[in-house]
Amino acid sequence: DPFGELYVIAVPESTGAAATVTLTVTGAATETGTVNVYVGRTRVQAPVTNGDNVTMIASSIQDAINAVPTLPFTASSSAGVVTLTARHKGLCGNEIPVSLNYYGFGGGEVLPAGVQIAVATGTAGTGAPVLTGAVAAMADEPFDYIGLPFNDTASVNTLVTEMNDTSGRWSYARQLYGHVYTAKTGTLSELVTAGDQFNQQHITLAGYEKD
């Protein structure tokens, strides 16, 4: 939409812990190749040279990830283990997917011979931002579409209150209207539970199953 206005409201970082993910490298490379790490939809390619050991491969992955400042993670490595740490604290870091060789052999993405890498969840992110300031900043400005990047109960309920039919944006007194959109990843049962919990007429929760 080249004509629609877009407003973005920054919110304070939540108190809590930042999510982490680990990539554990085993085996020395017996050929030259590339490690393809996907952080969300972004592919990061780390070069591997024949003869590289686990420490060298992990360092290459670390450097490749840190070379992309727009990624939601920063990387560190030690003794063949790469640790990705979310740039921001909070529950939202738990849903950032990290995978290897998404397109597989057919897409030309395979680990170099001799190398194995295991991806695992590390420390779970905790905490959610306080959105009362953001809601106050919206004041009585009408918005057709409101994007909510957080899907925790407290954040969604803050918007539920703002959008309600009695005193919120859909009330007779305010008549601002609009609709909120957010998303969640999880197992099928987790998404069903979330859908039941957030069954609100003015909020759409898009659910995506984890790979």
What are these regions (language model features)?
Residues 2-15, 118-123:
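A broadly used, surface-exposed interaction patch
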Residues 1-2, 24-99, 146, 161-166:
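Extended, beta-strand-rich, solvent-exposed assembly scaffolds of outer structural proteins
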Residues 7-11, 20-26, 125-138:
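Short, charged beta->alpha transition segments
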Residues 49, 53, 123-126, 151:
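Catalytic cores of large soluble enzymes that bind and process phosphate-bearing ligands
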Residues 9-18, 55-60:
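Short, basic/low-complexity N-terminal boundary segments at the transition from targeting/disordered tails
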Residues 31, 35-39, 103-129:
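Bacterial flagellar/type III secretion structural subunits and associated motility module proteins
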Residues 1-2, 63, 138-211:
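A glycine- and small-residue-enriched flexible loop/hinge signal that marks low-structured segments
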